């Protein structure tokens, strides 16, 4: 994954310090592209240990059209917890619960989860019901019947609903491309947290590419990741400096259950990662 480390080095060398919405501060560049050939292995970062379980569960959650953190919390996936908890803290229902206590209520009290666990019409809602359109169903049908189309688009940016979302989509637009029996996917990401988010996004959208390729009888080929504002938060600079000193290892292989022919039939047990060798964990706080 030298491709990713090159991005880190580029930002460290060429980036500008900027203020941001979270008041954390970033070092940032605008406009950057990375390419990952899935025939060379599954692009899961090896210069720090990645939480693949969270990546898979979040992607399945998107594909279910779900927007409530309850499923994620029940599967010990914590990447979306801060946003509904922050909203709950500002509500009249807040009784000084800690984040841990809040999550226990989400996990064990269905009515509480319905009321306080929803993120608004975020990714899953837009993927499966964009103003009445199931974009995933349409995409798969189009790839099968009209593979040369230049309209194989998945869009998460729905302007009238942005202010109802806990966080407007960062990974905004996806385009698929079919050539000689191979399927590629390009993601445009308006904003990318290079230390925490980007490695997660690379693996997630590469996995989505593999899933869609399987159910459309194509071979997964290339994931292209195009970034708008690519930034390293100021409180992640030390971790990134550590990471770029590490030597990438050979990429692992991701095996999908070959019996799955429908995108909605995938479950967590249908994914097997083989030969993953990595360096140790590098932690960093998420900016909310």
Swiss-Prot record:
The active site is at residue 170. It comes from the Bacteria. One of its GO terms (biological process) is dTMP biosynthetic process. The keyword Methyltransferase applies. Gene3D superfamilies: Thymidylate synthase/dCMP hydroxymethylase domain. SUPFAM superfamilies: Thymidylate synthase/dCMP hydroxymethylase. Keywords: Cytoplasm, Methyltransferase, Nucleotide biosynthesis, Transferase. InterPro entries: Thymidate_synth/dCMP_Mease, Thymidate_synth/dCMP_Mease_dom, Thymidate_synth/dCMP_Mease_sf, Thymidylate_synthase, Thymidylate_synthase_AS. (6R)-5,10-methylene-5,6,7,8-tetrahydrofolate binds at residues 51, 193, 287. One of its GO terms (cellular component) is cytosol. It is an enzyme of class 2 (transferase). Catalyzes the reductive methylation of 2'-deoxyuridine-5'-monophosphate (dUMP) to 2'-deoxythymidine-5'-monophosphate (dTMP) while utilizing 5,10-methylenetetrahydrofolate (mTHF) as the methyl donor and reductant in the reaction, yielding dihydrofolate (DHF) as a by-product. This enzymatic reaction provides an intracellular de novo source of dTMP, an essential precursor for DNA biosynthesis. Belongs to the thymidylate synthase family. Bacterial-type ThyA subfamily. HAMAP family: Thymidy_synth_bact. Homodimer. This is Thymidylate synthase. It comes from Onion yellows phytoplasma (strain OY-M). The gene is thyA.
């Amino acid at each position: 994954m030298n491709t990713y480390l090159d991005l880190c080095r580029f930002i460290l060398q060429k980036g500008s310090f900027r203020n941001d919405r979270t008041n954390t501060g970033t070092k940032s560049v605008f406009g950057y592209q990375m390419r990952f050939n899935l025939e060379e292995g599954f692009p899961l970062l090896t210069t720090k240990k990645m939480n693949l379980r969270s990546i898979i569960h979040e992607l399945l959650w998107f594909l279910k059209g779900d927007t409530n953190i309850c499923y994620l919390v029940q599967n010990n996936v914590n990447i979306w917890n801060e946003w509904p908890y922050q909203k709950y803290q500002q509500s009249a229902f807040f009784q000084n619960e800690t984040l841990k206590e809040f999550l226990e209520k989400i996990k064990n009290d269905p009515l509480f989860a319905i009321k306080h666990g929803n993120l608004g019409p975020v990714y899953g809602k837009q993927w499966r019901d964009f103003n009445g359109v199931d974009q995933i169903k349409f995409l798969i049908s189009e790839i099968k019947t009209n593979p040369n189309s230049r309209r194989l688009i998945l869009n998460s940016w729905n302007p009238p609903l942005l202010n109802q979302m806990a966080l407007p989509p960062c990974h905004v637009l996806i385009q698929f491309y079919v050539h000689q029996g191979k399927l590629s996917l390009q993601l445009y990401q308006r904003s990318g947290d290079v230390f925490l988010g980007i490695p997660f996004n690379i693996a997630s959208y590469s996995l989505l590419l593999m899933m869609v390729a399987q159910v459309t009888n194509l071979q997964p080929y290339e994931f292209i990741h195009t970034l708008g504002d690519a930034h390293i938060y100021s409180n992640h600079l030390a971790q990134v400096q550590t990471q770029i000193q590490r030597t990438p290892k050979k990429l692992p292989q991701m095996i999908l259950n070959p019996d799955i022919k429908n995108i909605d039939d995938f479950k967590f047990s249908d994914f097997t990662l083989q030969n993953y060798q990595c360096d140790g964990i590098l932690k960093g706080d998420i900016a909310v």
